[in-house]
């Protein structure tokens, strides 16, 4: 009877000995409030806003540029989270099956080009929808990750691999190299701007340092990359996103959102700069919401000297300010 007791005790000793030993003398991770200002500046100045790239006027002497964009995520959010629920997949299927055709019909009705930021996995899952987007009114397909992964959770090498893989997938599917990127979840790592430059992209649309187009700085140095800034106020997710199992359960009337977006447009028009909307087919494509978007388009078109354009065309025009 004593032998099992002895063996159990021996096993416990071995296991305890294998555990890491922590002492009060070990150096603890430095806390943010202990950082000196040099380190703080180094961190915050990795990626900053440079000069304003708003031209004196947009093409055709337009006063304001309007960029409608749609992040066509489809099933990738659920796939990224390894939530393989048919219920969640059906929401992504709705985006492809119903919403994208509705959006394309609206854009065609009002003769408006738009930009679609699409994860590469969405491109592979829904080739017919991608083909329809490309064939209609020169709409743009921009990068939006491989499977809607968060860049800040990846190593630099893993982020590089997925960005290159996404770039080649979009290029192969559309016959055209993508000109720009909107990072999934607007998530920017310490390596993202470096990798954008490696790919030869001309613009990003993920950051929030201005309302106007601006040049990105990397460690204080101009990069030549145009930023077309985004803002949660001008995104449909905060108003229409819904999570069954969390506190994200907004219930906002579409026309209340219309008032917010119309007010934002009016100020952009007054300032003579840029108006960027970020939308998602799985949210904006529902009946009452696509009707609201149509009302917004009609409202914008009552104004003179408005240039509706893709992100690529806006970035190319703004980039002239850098090159001149």
Language model: regions and residue ranges:
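Bacterial N-terminal signal peptides
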Residues: 9-20
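Bacterial N-terminal signal peptides that target proteins for export
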Residues: 1-11
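Active-site-adjacent pocket scaffolds in enzyme catalytic domains
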Residues: 29-59, 168-172, 176-271
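Metal-dependent polysaccharide deacetylase catalytic core of the NodB/CE4 family, i.e.
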Residues: 101-104, 108-189, 223, 229-246, ...
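Boundary at the C-terminal end of the N-terminal hydrophobic targeting segment
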Residues: 21-25
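Residue-level marker for buried hydrophobic side chains located in beta-strands
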Residues: 66-68, 141, 307
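C-terminal domain-boundary segment and adjacent tail
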Residues: 109, 203, 215, 255-324
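Active-site beta->alpha N-cap acidic-glycine motif
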Residues: 33-137, 147, 259, 299
């Amino acid at each position: 009877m004593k032998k099992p007791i002895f063996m159990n005790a021996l096993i416990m000793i071995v296991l305890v000995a294998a555990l890491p030993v922590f002492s009060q003398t070990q150096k603890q991770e430095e806390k943010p409030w202990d950082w000196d200002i040099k380190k703080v500046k180094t961190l915050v100045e990795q990626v900053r806003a440079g000069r304003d790239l708003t031209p004196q006027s947009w093409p055709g002497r337009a006063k304001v540029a309007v960029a409608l964009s749609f992040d066509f995520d489809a099933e990738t959010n659920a796939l990224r989270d390894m939530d393989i629920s048919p219920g969640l997949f059906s929401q992504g299927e709705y985006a492809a099956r119903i919403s994208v055709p509705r959006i394309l019909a609206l854009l065609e009705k009002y003769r408006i080009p738009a930009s679609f930021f699409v994860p590469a996995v969405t491109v592979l899952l829904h080739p017919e929808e991608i083909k329809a987007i490309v064939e209609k009114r020169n709409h743009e397909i921009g990068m939006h990750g491989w499977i809607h992964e968060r860049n800040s959770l990846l190593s630099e090498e893993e982020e590089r691999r997925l960005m290159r893989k996404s770039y080649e997938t979009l290029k192969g599917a559309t016959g055209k190299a993508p000109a720009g990127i909107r990072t999934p979840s607007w998530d920017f790592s310490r390596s993202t701007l470096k990798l954008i430059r490696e790919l030869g992209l001309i613009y990003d649309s993920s950051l929030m340092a201005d309302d106007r187009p601006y040049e990105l700085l990397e460690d204080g140095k101009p990069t030549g990359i145009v930023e077309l800034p985004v803002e949660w106020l001008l995104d449909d997710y905060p108003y229409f996103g819904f999570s069954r199992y969390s506190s994200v359960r907004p219930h906002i009337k579409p026309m209340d959102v219309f008032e917010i977006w119309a007010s934002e447009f009016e100020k952009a028009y007054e300032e003579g700069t840029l108006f960027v909307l970020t939308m998602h087919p799985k949210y904006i494509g529902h009946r009452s919401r696509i009707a609201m978007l149509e009302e917004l388009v009609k409202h914008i078109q009552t104004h003179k000297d408005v240039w509706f354009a893709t992100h690529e065309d806006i970035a190319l025009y703004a980039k002239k300010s850098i090159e001149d």
